[in-house]
C-alpha cells in the first residue's frame, strides 16, 4: 500500500512537472517578435541613381544582410519589409523570393518620411509582443545585437543598441559657438535595431500623429517624448 501511494505520488509529481514545462514552453512560443525593416529611404547622401539599400556589398545587395540575420535568428518570428511603392515588386522577386526569406510575410509601401514608414510598419503588425525597427541600409547586425536589444527591451520596454562614443562631442549654440562639452562617458552613438514592447511604441507613435514630427530623428525620440519610459542603452 505504502509503495503504491509513493509510486502514485511520484507519478502525479512527474505529470505536474510535464504540465508546468509544457505551459512554460507554450508561453515562450506565444511571445512573438517582429522585425520592421525599412528600405524606403532615398539615400540622397550617397548620390547616384541606385538606392543605397540596393547597392551591392560583395555578392549581395546591402538589404540582404540584415534580412538574412533576422531570417536566421531564433528571436525573430516575422519580418515586415517597408519599401518605396515602386520597389515592392523588385523586393519581392529580387530579394525575398530570390534569397528565400520566408519570414518576410508582408512587403508594404512606406511613407514620405522615415517616421511615416515606421508607423505603416507598426500598423501592419498583427500578433506582436516586441518589435525591432531597423534601417535596411545598415547591414552590420548580428544575433548578439538582436539578443542584446531584446533583453534590454524586456527590462524596461525600450532598448536602443549603440556604442559609447570614442570621440569628444560638443554641443553648439544657435550661433555656432561651443555651448557645452558633455562627459564622454555619458555620450552614446545610437544605431538600429531599436527594440520596443509593441504596445508601447504603437501608443507613442499614435500619440505623435497630431504633432510636428520633423524633429524626430529616431524611434527612441518618440518614446522619450510621449511616454516618459526610460530607454535602456545596450
Name every feature range the model reports, one short phrase each.
Residues 140-232:
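Conserved core of the sugar-phosphate nucleotidyltransferase
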Residues 99-112:
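Conserved donor nucleotide-binding strand/loop of the catalytic core
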Residues 16-29:
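Short, Lys/Arg-enriched N-terminal segments with co-localized hydrophobic residues
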Residues 37, 63, 121, 135, ...:
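Residue-level signal for inorganic ion chemistry
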Residues 31-88:
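N-terminal glycine-rich phosphate-binding loop and ensuing alpha1 helix
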Residues 119-130:
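Active-site nucleotide-sugar/metal-binding loop of Leloir-type enzymes
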Amino acid at each position: 500500500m505504502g509503495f503504491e501511494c509513493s509510486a502514485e505520488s511520484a507519478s502525479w509529481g512527474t505529470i505536474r512537472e510535464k504540465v508546468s514545462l509544457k505551459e512554460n514552453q507554450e508561453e515562450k512560443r506565444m511571445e512573438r517578435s517582429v522585425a520592421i525593416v525599412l528600405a524606403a529611404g532615398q539615400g540622397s547622401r550617397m548620390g547616384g541613381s541606385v538606392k543605397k539599400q540596393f547597392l551591392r556589398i560583395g555578392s549581395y545587395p546591402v538589404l540582404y544582410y540584415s534580412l538574412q540575420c533576422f531570417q536566421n535568428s531564433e528571436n525573430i518570428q516575422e519580418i515586415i519589409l517597408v519599401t518605396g511603392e515602386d520597389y515592392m515588386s523588385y523586393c519581392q522577386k529580387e530579394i525575398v523570393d530570390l534569397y528565400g526569406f520566408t519570414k518576410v510575410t508582408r512587403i508594404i509601401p512606406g511613407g514620405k518620411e522615415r517616421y511615416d514608414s515606421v508607423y505603416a510598419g507598426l500598423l501592419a503588425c498583427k500578433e506582436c509582443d516586441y518589435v525591432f525597427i531597423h534601417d535596411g541600409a545598415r547591414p552590420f547586425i548580428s544575433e548578439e545585437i538582436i539578443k542584446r536589444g531584446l533583453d534590454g527591451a524586456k527590462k524596461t520596454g525600450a532598448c536602443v543598441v549603440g556604442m559609447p562614443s570614442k570621440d569628444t562631442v560638443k554641443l553648439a549654440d544657435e550661433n555656432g559657438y561651443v555651448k557645452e562639452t558633455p562627459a564622454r562617458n555619458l555620450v552614446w552613438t545610437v544605431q538600429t535595431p531599436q527594440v520596443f514592447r509593441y504596445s508601447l511604441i504603437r501608443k507613442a507613435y499614435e500619440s505623435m500623429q497630431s504633432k510636428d514630427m520633423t524633429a524626430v530623428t529616431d524611434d527612441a525620440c518618440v518614446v522619450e517624448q510621449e511616454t516618459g519610459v526610460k530607454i535602456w542603452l545596450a
